[in-house]
């Protein structure tokens, strides 16, 4: 895990196919992926139309509400921890990948070790 500009980036492995960096964001409801990343995942057949689950309205940090297409990631790996069937949402192409509560809340506890720059998942 790397601290970049005050946020922590952690490598995530999607469907055991592609590894990308995500911001650890406990305030995000779901794992969020920019539209261009989702298109890449579709082109590489990492996800397909069968993974899409409809639209949900999300409330952003500024209080505004935005609809977003949801999809399911078959497997998402962070470090040595892999979860299956993780919900994700599509955000504008200019956004970062966020590692949100649809992943984090499935652990009994999680924390960030600032000294070791590590995400601890239990």
Show which residues each predicted segment covers:
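Pepsin/retropepsin-fold aspartyl endopeptidases
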Residues: 1-122
């Amino acid at each position: 895990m790397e601290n970049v500009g005050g946020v922590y980036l952690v490598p995530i492995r999607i469907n055991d196919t592609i590894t990308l960096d995500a911001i650890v964001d406990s305030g995000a409801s779901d794992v969020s992926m920019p539209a261009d990343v989702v298109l890449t995942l579709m082109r590489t057949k990492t996800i397909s139309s069968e993974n899409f689950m409809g639209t949900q309205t999300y409330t952003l940090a500024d209080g505004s509400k935005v609809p977003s297409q949801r999809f399911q990631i078959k497997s998402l790996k962070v470090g040595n921890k892999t979860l299956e069937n993780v919900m994700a949402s599509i955000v504008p192409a200019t956004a970062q990948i966020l590692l949100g509560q649809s992943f984090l809340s499935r652990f009994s506890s999680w924390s960030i070790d600032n000294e070791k720059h590590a995400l601890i998942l239990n």
